[in-house]
Amino acid sequence: RYTGVSADEAPLHRLGSGQWEKARRKAAEQYLVSGRVLDGLAVLRPLARDQDLPFPETPNRAKLRLVLDSARFTLRGIHFSPPTAPLAPADALRLETCWSAAKGLSFIDPLRAATFAGEHLRRCLAHGEPGRVARALAHYALLDVNIGSPRKAARGQARIQRAHHLAQGTGDPLLIGLTTIIRGVADLNCGRWRRAVTRVEAGIDRLGERRLGVTWERSIARAMAMHALVMLGDWPALGPRAAAWLREAEELGDRFACVVAGLYVGHARLADADLAGARQAAATARALWSADGVVDGFHFQHWLALGLEVACELADARPHAAWQRVSAAWPAIGTSDLLRIQVPRIDILGMRAHAALALAHVSSDRSSLLRTAAALAASLAREPLVHARAAAAALRAGVAELRGERPAARRGFARATELFHASDMPVHAACVRRRLAALAC
């Protein structure tokens, strides 16, 4: 079985205490990374308690731990000394439990995942084994890159680079593959789409032909590659890659990968004008993620599904439906942790703004909708990434057009075209340029 802990294997009650704890850790990890969230949490919570590991039960407690971890690493640095003695089995199990929780929760509960990532790094630095430090440092450093602050992003990228050098020093292809993938994730967060695709696919190559045991690493790499291809508008590359990933995920019974791959299949269908197929992909993904084993909340998977659904509504000239979808999800989005993370934050703000602007074309409440779109554009303009500022310029131009300010609209669309080209987003640039040409008529 995919989880590696199926009921038809040797009964767990026959295992010794050390083997039992290892089996619990593996079960928690595999449940979580494959999308069996409730099953994973049911194993992880008592496991963390039994090992005296922190498991923050509220968002505020998790945020407090993040602040303390950040201060700790700022004060002590990330230096370490090679170990002078082997790691005790109980301590090794705690390290691996932290790692299992950090990666297993990363695309479900990023705030709690970050607390485990910090605990993992703290313990790995204390022990000093270079391979474990490389793994922990690369993963923890993504927290800085994800936020969007230029200063923190630079620090995060420097730490990821150091982790990659440590991994290369070990000669372990799995560790080198992981840190290569994480370098690609950092590229994506910085808007370097082509480099992101190159690096995450190089990381997959370093992992070799293995599928079991590195499923999470392969899934994260593929998810990043799919997102980068969407930003590039490279639909001919996206479709076959997403379909191949979906087939593999179905063979493994990997719910997480089935959902994410299926949604990118939906994007490829939408680009091919298969609106019904795109809608079906979104519906299938939502149903699968809402099946048994998923906790309440608004996860990465909900964000990806909402983006495809809103795109379908706009492509089908249904702005009321697009706005209703975003508005219905907005309270859950606000209470989630996704707006702390740069990539979904930019996408979600743009999604809401585009829905508002589209509806303003046909609504009697035009003034209110234009104010909403303008406010969201202002938020996007404050983001450090160029493509966010491009989206802001295009949205402001759209607002100006509906207000009858044609010269301002032309300037805005021209600026957005330049910025989208600078962001290596030719399809977005072409769409804006088409709107600019329409204004010239």
PLM regions and their residue ranges:
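Amphipathic helix-loop-helix modules that constitute alpha-helical solenoid scaffolds
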Residues: 32-118, 146-158, 194-198, 214-219, ...
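Alpha-solenoid helical repeat architecture
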Residues: 15-24, 56-63, 89-94, 128-139, ...
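Amphipathic alpha-helical segments of tetratricopeptide repeats
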Residues: 9-13, 46-56, 121-125, 161-171, ...
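Generic long, charged, amphipathic alpha-helical segments
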Residues: 366-432
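Extended alpha-helical scaffolding segments used for macromolecular assembly and cargo binding
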Residues: 1-34, 38-47, 87-129, 133-136, ...
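Conserved small-residue packing positions in alpha-helical repeats and bundles
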Residues: 28, 102, 121, 141, ...
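Hydrophobic, small-residue-rich alpha-helical packing segments that form membrane-like cores
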Residues: 148-251
